[in-house]
């Protein structure tokens, strides 16, 4: 198909990306650990972690996981907020040859049970604050190994110990729990896992771009939560697509390793996860915000040092602007405000740009596409109200109910094809048959219109279908 949108790409944005430059996502990680060892990777509550530390910690945890006798490709669940433990755990799982299953820490017992049972996860790394929820359902799942993290595990010996004490005993944010140990089930503290893993060796694993990296759960286009099967190829492609698209906004920084991105969106969310992995590739760093709903503390974090990229959702931007301390934030270094998760309103975007000097750039994507789909050019000077152009190596087609492509300017279902698009829903053959068209496009359930310049907008109303937008980027 003709890619009419390419003519509107900003200078420097590639038309295509090549995931084959890496043999796997873990190859990308190993390269980053080698090339950026002494660079900072993240900061959380003023505790820094370098790439060298991320390498060592994830290597230790990966070795420990292997020592539990897990089969290659086993699913390991992660139920953590934006703490340093998240990246360590994610990298450990992948380096050990397993599959990550991201879990929303605020899930109810019913939601948690469904996801653990559907994925077949045999292990879980969970913050102790949420262990009481796990206790309710663990007997109905295949979980055999529980790694129990505390908030202060990676925040330094003194500050970390104090934070854990404060959360447990002062704020009383850790409900009482008792995880059953029958049937050989193990419960091990995060710190003990790292200590034991340091005495072990991480065994090399043979992984390809076609191995499964993540089961990313989503409502899908309809029905119950489903696991989108995201391969190493899908994730590597998404990283390269995001990097290519964002570069025009960030290139003025010079050394991309100096980029400071604010990670306020939860890392179990596919867009934040992709940006975390982009930071690993680039050697840049993340400022982790464990609880962005505490806007006072969030603003204090934003005031601590210059930041260059701020992804968020409409409600987050609105709440920030309404806070009395908002005007004390220095936005002079902000190069990119990336909006998604829900439709950004023109009023919010106009107010944000007036207050910060940064245009709000809106995009669209899904868990099924690694959060990558369309995005407005990052060189855009003002909010557009549409969802932008397809990113490198992505094709967007507007199709009718029979899967036939419609002429430019017609309203129909937005369908997407590209190396970042999932291979299907986990153990859902009937759903997969309905989700993909004969020519390999994925039906998104969103209704839109593409204009002659290649820009797409979500249709406000459509007479044949009434479906919620899956916009998440």
Regions found by a protein language model. Name each.
Residues 55-60, 193-200, 228-253, 317-318:
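Conserved structural elements of the adenylate-forming
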Residues 67-68, 95-192:
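Structural core segment of the AMP-binding/adenylate-forming
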Residues 218, 463-469:
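Conserved small/polar residues in nucleotide/adenosyl-binding loops
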Residues 174, 178-217, 224, 249-260:
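Conserved pre-ATP/AMP-binding loop-to-beta segment of ANL
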Residues 20-21, 38-83, 87-91, 108-113:
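Conserved AMP-binding/adenylate-forming core of the ANL superfamily
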Residues 162, 304-312, 321-382, 395:
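Gly/Ser/Thr-rich phosphate-binding loop
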């Amino acid at each position: 198909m003709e890619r009419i949108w390419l003519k509107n790409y900003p200078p420097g944005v590639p038309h295509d990306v090549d995931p084959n430059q890496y043999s796997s996502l873990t190859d990308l990680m190993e390269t980053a650990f080698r090339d950026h060892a002494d660079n900072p990777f993240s900061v959380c509550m003023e505790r820094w972690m370098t790439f060298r530390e991320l390498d060592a910690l994830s290597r230790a945890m990966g070795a420990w996981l292997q020592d539990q006798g897990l089969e290659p490709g086993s699913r390991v669940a992660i139920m953590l907020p934006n703490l340093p433990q998240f990246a360590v755990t994610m990298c450990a799982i992948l380096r050990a040859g397993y599959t990550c299953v991201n879990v929303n820490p605020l899930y109810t017992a019913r939601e948690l049970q469904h996801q653990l049972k559907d994925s077949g996860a045999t292990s879980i790394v969970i913050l102790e604050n949420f262990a009481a929820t796990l206790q309710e359902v663990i007997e109905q799942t295949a979980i055999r190994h529980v790694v129990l993290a505390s908030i202060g595990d990676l925040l330094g010996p003194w500050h970390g110990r104090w934070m854990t004490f404060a959360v447990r005993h002062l704020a009383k944010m850790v409900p009482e729990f008792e995880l059953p140990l029958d049937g050989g089930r193990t419960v091990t503290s995060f710190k003990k896992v790292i200590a034991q893993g340091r005495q072990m060796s991480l065994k090399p694993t043979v992984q390809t771009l076609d191995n499964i990296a993540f089961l990313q759960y989503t409502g899908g286009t309809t029905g119950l939560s489903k696991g989108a099967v995201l391969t190493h190829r899908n994730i590597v492609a998404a990283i390269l697509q995001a990097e290519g698209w964002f570069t025009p906004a960030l290139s003025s920084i010079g050394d991309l390793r100096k980029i400071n991105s604010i990670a306020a969106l939860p890392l179990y969310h596919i867009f934040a996860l992709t940006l975390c992995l982009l930071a690993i590739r680039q050697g840049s760093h993340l400022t982790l915000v464990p609880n962005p709903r505490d806007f006072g503390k969030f603003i204090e974090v934003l005031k601590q040092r210059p930041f260059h990229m701020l992804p968020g959702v409409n409600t987050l931007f609105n709440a920030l602007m309404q806070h009395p301390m908002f005007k004390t934030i220095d936005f002079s270094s902000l190069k990119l405000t990336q909006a998604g998760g829900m439709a950004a309103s023109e009023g919010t975007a106009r107010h944000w740009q007036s207050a910060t000097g940064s245009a709000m750039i809106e995009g669209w994507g899904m868990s099924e596409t690694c959060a990558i789909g369309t995005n407005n050019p990052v060189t855009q000077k003002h909010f557009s109200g549409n969802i932008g152009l397809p990113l490198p190596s992505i094709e967007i087609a507007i199709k009718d109910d029979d899967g036939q492509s419609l002429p430019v300017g017609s309203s129909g279902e937005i369908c997407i094809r590209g190396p970042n698009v999932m291979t299907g829903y986990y153990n859902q053959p009937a759903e997969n048959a309905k989700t993909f068209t004969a020519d390999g496009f994925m039906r998104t359930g969103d209704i839109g219109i593409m204009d002659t310049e290649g820009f797409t907008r979500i249709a406000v109303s459509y007479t044949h279908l009434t479906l919620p937008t899956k916009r998440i980027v």
